[in-house]
């Protein structure tokens, strides 16, 4: 058996589990993952240690939690055990991919491992001299690399995970995260943790109260400088008659798996 490296484990989005803690938390990047991780660590008395280890809370998850001997095996046993309640935090797929796009614009253009791939993709389409990337182009890029089996980035992959989703007892929509986690605590006899103080993260890109993006925002090539100068647009501005069908096609598996919570019309109205 090939031994997984730390980077490989990090990319797997393994659930959060602790022996003796009654909840297994399944999650996806760009779906409240930092808040859920903090909630989990607080319940297990590890949050202070994790924040001391690194300002970026996921470093503790990657370097410490996922590196524990037998951790993946524990995950696989736990999701099949009646001793654990398995929850998964999910997010409207349209809102999530907008968040991924804004995150790319804000912080990932320089360090993102896909930057060279995106640059090549643009050059092949005669866009090599274009500065930045529009939301429409971002969705086209995701579609194209997915067709070639190269959609490596968990921020861009669908949320549905065949390894874990079939074992989930309850879906917790990010839009109702506080209530969903409180209900989990009630059912499992856990003390209440107020997530309000845990929800702030440096990688959130909240919409500006006032922005100056053009009406046809989804076709507008943007960079981090655009966010500084024009503000952060609301998701509803980027989700239009062109991009909504693209999102629906790319993340159809999520819409089918989480149809109880998310429909196309809701995605557009958000």
Regions found by a protein language model. Give the residues of each.
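Membrane-interface amphipathic segments in extracytoplasmic regions
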Residues: 1-270
């Amino acid at each position: 058996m090939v031994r997984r490296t730390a980077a490989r484990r990090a990319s797997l989005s393994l659930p959060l589990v602790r022996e003796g803690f009654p909840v297994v938390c399944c999650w996806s990047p760009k779906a409240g993952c930092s808040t859920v991780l903090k909630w989990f660590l607080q319940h297990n008395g590890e949050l202070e240690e994790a924040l001391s280890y690194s300002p970026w809370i996921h470093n503790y998850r990657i370097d410490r939690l996922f590196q524990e001997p037998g951790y993946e095996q524990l995950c696989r046993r736990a999701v099949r055990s009646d001793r654990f309640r398995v929850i998964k935090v999910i997010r409207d797929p349209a809102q999530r991919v907008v968040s991924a796009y804004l995150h790319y614009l804000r912080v990932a253009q320089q360090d993102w491992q896909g930057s060279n791939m995106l640059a090549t993709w643009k050059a092949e389409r005669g866009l090599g001299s274009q500065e930045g990337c529009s939301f429409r182009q971002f969705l086209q890029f995701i579609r194209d690399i997915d067709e070639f089996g190269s959609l490596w980035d968990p921020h861009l992959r669908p949320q549905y995970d065949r390894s874990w989703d079939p074992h989930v007892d309850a879906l917790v929509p990010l839009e109702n995260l506080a209530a969903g986690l409180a209900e989990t605590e009630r059912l499992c006899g856990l003390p209440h943790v107020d997530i309000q103080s845990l929800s702030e993260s440096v990688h959130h890109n909240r919409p500006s109260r006032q922005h100056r993006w053009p009406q046809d925002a989804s076709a507008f090539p943007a960079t981090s400088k655009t966010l500084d100068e024009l503000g952060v647009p609301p998701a509803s501005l980027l989700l239009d008659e062109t991009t909504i069908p693209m999102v629906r096609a790319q993340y159809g598996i999520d819409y089918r798996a989480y149809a109880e919570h998310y429909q196309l019309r809701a995605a557009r109205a958000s």
